[in-house]
Amino acid sequence: IVADVGQDTWEEVSIAAAGANLGWSRAEANSCFAKHGPCTLSDYKGAFVQYGREEGKSVTGGYVYRGAQIPALKGLYIFADFVSGRIWSAPLPSTKSPVSAHVQLGQFGRLISSFGQADDGTLYVLDFAKGAALKIVASSSN
């Protein structure tokens, strides 16, 4: 799974096998990037998640949730945005649905630089500014 910071318009997350062509510099996420000549999107491996600059400006890759503490997240890809502090989940793509809708899980006043995963599948958010590792837990309303 590749989280790719965009150029001007889109942040993207793709599943790419070794050597896959994600389209740069002709495509950005699932859109042609007009500054660099002709573009045929079917030539490239598209993103399964993309979001625009109104949601964030620098995607931070995460993990597929495999823990037992939050069953509702099981099998979902958890990722974030470094600038906005938003954390999202998205189902992995399938042949029936190659593009996934992402759901915001929370927004924090933090610079989320990475995630960590414990042996039991517990996920942690890494805060760049404070050097902290914060455990992801279910909200008390769940």
Walk through the language-model features, giving the residues of each:
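Beta-propeller domain segments
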Residues: 1-101, 132, 136-139
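Short coil-to-beta transitions that initiate beta-strands within beta-rich domains
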Residues: 59, 107-113
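Small/polar loops that bind or transfer phosphate-bearing groups
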Residues: 79, 107, 125
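Conserved beta-strand positions that form and line the central face of beta-propeller blades
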Residues: 104
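Blade-level signature of beta-propeller repeat domains, shared across WD40, Kelch, NHL, RCC1
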Residues: 113-142
